[in-house]
């Protein structure tokens, strides 16, 4: 075993013939080094294990860039990383216990969609940072999208383009991001000297099955046969996808007759809209990287850091 260890960590000190035999055996046996044991032996060295709790982040396609950025950043700085899924709200305590058994040096709690979480008691006092979520404890550092400013600036873009009759189809009221986005829109509308009475605003019901409710809503706002709105502001790109189908089927020209604004910049989808969808980029990659750097760099202090969300102006506005 000493010879194997020397080959793994200082191959130049081993005779070539011996090194080749050991490497061949490693490949044949699919040997994997015990990193946790190596860490225990490396007393006095900088900690190097980053653990990730993933609540719907790894099991849905919408925010997986958070995880990719965390892993890439950890690798860039020579840290190891591993992930444990949280399968439901009630599963967080189990996942936390499983994670702590590995004695990580830092923990990142991630969620799909901006959420308010209840941190398992076992994680209090640990070196932890939140990514795409917030908690009641102000001492917990968190990195989240700046939904308010993003919607404010996108509304300024629509106003500058001359749109004055918006129809808004927001995500469910229970969604944390919805409040920030609606507030941003309404503030921009008021700051432009406009009356909110001009605006038609609706919230999607909770559940993915309700995206198609937008079809009925749009049909109700064609009087007679023409839309009573000049821009549709969608809670996300999936809602915009439904809207495109309804509008184009009615012969509506986008954006000449009605403009459409999305949110999220769903991976691999924005440019597939015809015409390409104007939307807002959720900065999941930056959120993941900053959360990882918070631990790797030993940043101090707990506060909410809001990450800018770029407006991607394409052809639908």
Features from the language model and the residues they span:
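Short beta-strand elements in bilobed, periplasmic/extracellular small-molecule ligand-binding domains
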Residues: 74-86, 186-214
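Flexible loop/turn connectors
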Residues: 219-317
């Amino acid at each position: 075993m000493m010879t194997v260890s020397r080959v793994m960590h200082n191959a130049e000190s081993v005779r070539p013939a011996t090194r080749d035999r050991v490497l061949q055996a490693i490949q044949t046996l699919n040997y994997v080094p015990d990193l946790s044991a190596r860490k225990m032996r490396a007393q006095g060295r900088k900690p190097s294990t980053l653990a990730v709790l993933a609540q719907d982040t790894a099991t849905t396609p919408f925010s997986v860039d958070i995880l990719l950025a965390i892993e890439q950043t950890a690798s860039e700085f020579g840290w190891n990383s591993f992930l444990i899924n949280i399968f439901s709200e009630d599963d967080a305590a189990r996942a936390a216990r499983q994670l702590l058994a590995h004695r990580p040096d830092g923990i990142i709690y991630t969620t799909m969609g901006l959420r308010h979480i209840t941190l398992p008691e076992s994680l209090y006092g640990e070196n932890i940072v939140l990514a795409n979520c917030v908690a009641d404890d102000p001492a917990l550092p968190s990195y989240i999208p700046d939904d308010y400013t993003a919607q404010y600036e996108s509304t300024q873009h629509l106003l500058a383009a001359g749109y004055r009759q918006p129809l808004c189809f927001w995500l469910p009221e229970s969604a944390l991001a919805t409040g920030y986005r609606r507030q941003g829109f309404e503030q921009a509308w008021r700051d432009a000297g406009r009356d909110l009475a001009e605006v038609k605003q609706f919230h999607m019901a909770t559940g993915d099955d309700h995206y198609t409710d937008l079809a009925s809503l749009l049909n109700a706002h064609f009087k007679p046969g023409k839309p009573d709105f000049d821009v549709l502001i969608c809670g996300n790109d999936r809602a915009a996808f439904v809207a495109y189908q309804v509008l184009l089927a009615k012969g509506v020209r986008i954006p000449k007759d009605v403009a459409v604004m999305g949110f999220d910049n769903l991976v691999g989808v924005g440019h597939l809209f015809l015409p390409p969808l104007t939307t807002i980029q959720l900065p999941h990659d930056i959120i993941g990287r900053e959360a990882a750097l918070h631990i790797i760099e030993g940043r101090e202090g707990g506060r909410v850091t809001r990450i800018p969300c770029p407006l991607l102006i394409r052809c639908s506005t």
